[in-house]
């Protein structure tokens, strides 16, 4: 149970950082609102994992979510440094 909680806490921290990064990129007038909404939804799902069954499923697909956060950072850097 403690291992599961630590995974959820780490993932929550990663989502919070991703949302903050999205807001900062958006302040530079680059439209990343859909990404902010997606990560906000994931953050809400992560924080609301009170049900043990849902928490175990989140633990099972944790690596996928971490890859999603990594892909988000790559996308944000692409939008920030390579203008269209």
From Swiss-Prot:
Compartments reported by the entry: Cell membrane
Record carries keyword Transmembrane: yes
Major location category of this protein: membrane
Record key words, sorted: Cell membrane, Membrane, Transmembrane, Transmembrane helix
Membrane topology: Multi-pass membrane protein
One GO CC annotation: plasma membrane
Positions of transmembrane segments: 8-28, 30-50, 63-83
Name the record gives this protein: Uncharacterized protein MJ0519
Organism expressing this protein natively: Methanocaldococcus jannaschii (strain ATCC 43067 / DSM 2661 / JAL-1 / JCM 10045 / NBRC 100440) (Methanococcus jannaschii)
Lineage: Archaea, Methanobacteriati, Methanobacteriota, Methanomada group, Methanococci
């Amino acid at each position: 149970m403690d291992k599961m909680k630590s995974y959820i806490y780490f993932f929550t921290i990663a989502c919070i950082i991703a949302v903050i990064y999205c807001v900062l990129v958006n302040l530079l007038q680059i439209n990343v609102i859909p990404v902010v909404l997606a990560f906000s939804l994931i953050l809400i799902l992560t924080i609301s994992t009170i049900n043990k069954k849902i928490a175990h499923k989140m633990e099972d697909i944790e690596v996928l979510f971490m890859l999603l956060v990594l892909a988000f950072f790559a996308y944000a850097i692409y939008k920030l440094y390579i203008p269209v």
